[in-house]
């Protein structure tokens, strides 16, 4: 039986993010890398997450922390709401909302992730968490106020 990709693309996992997570292909752009990294969190694949972090970030030191977090977190969904490139296409940004439950509580990560392309491969560098007012429209595009959507 086929399984839809956890990244929210509505495409089968085997045709979507699996080729990147398995190492068969290299993600062609920051959005594909971000979606495949989300899948790696869902599938609890610390190796892929570390491999796709830029080497300067020292992600191998985070292995134990990543693995410990897997046991307590259930990922519920991903919404990408913006992506763009700079510096001749070698720096990319992807803004998203990732919903999860942890310890019985529902939460959301809202982030603008930064990616760098080196030697034909994209790497995750870091992310910023934009601040939204409670009455601002939710960035996920639901049409609801932030406080009634991802800000809960």
Curated annotation (Swiss-Prot):
Residues annotated as signal peptide: none
A Pfam family of this chain: YchJ_M-like
Source species, domain of life: Bacteria
InterPro entries, sorted: NTF2-like_dom_sf (IPR032710), SEC_C_motif (IPR004027), UPF0225 (IPR023006), YchJ-like_M (IPR048469)
Family statement: Belongs to the UPF0225 family.
PANTHER family: ADENYLATE CYCLASE-ASSOCIATED CAP C-TERMINAL DOMAIN-CONTAINING PROTEIN (PTHR33747:SF1), UPF0225 PROTEIN SCO1677 (PTHR33747)
Name under which the protein is recorded: UPF0225 protein YchJ
């Amino acid at each position: 039986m086929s399984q839809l990709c956890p990244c929210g693309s509505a495409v089968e996992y085997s045709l979507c993010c699996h080729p990147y997570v398995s190492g068969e292909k290299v993600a062609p752009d920051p959005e594909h890398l971000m979606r495949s990294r989300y899948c790696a969190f869902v599938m609890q694949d610390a190796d892929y997450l570390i491999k796709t972090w830029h080497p300067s970030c020292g992600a191998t030191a985070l292995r134990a922390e990543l693995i410990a977090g897997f046991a307590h977190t259930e990922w519920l969904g991903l919404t990408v709401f913006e992506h763009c490139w700079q510096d001749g296409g070698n720096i990319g940004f992807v803004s998203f909302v990732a919903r999860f439950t942890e310890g019985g509580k529902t939460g959301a990560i809202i982030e603008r992730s930064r990616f760098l392309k080196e030697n034909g491969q994209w790497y995750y560098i870091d992310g910023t968490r934009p601040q939204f007012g409670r009455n601002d429209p939710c960035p996920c595009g639901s049409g609801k106020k932030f406080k009634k959507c991802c800000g809960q």
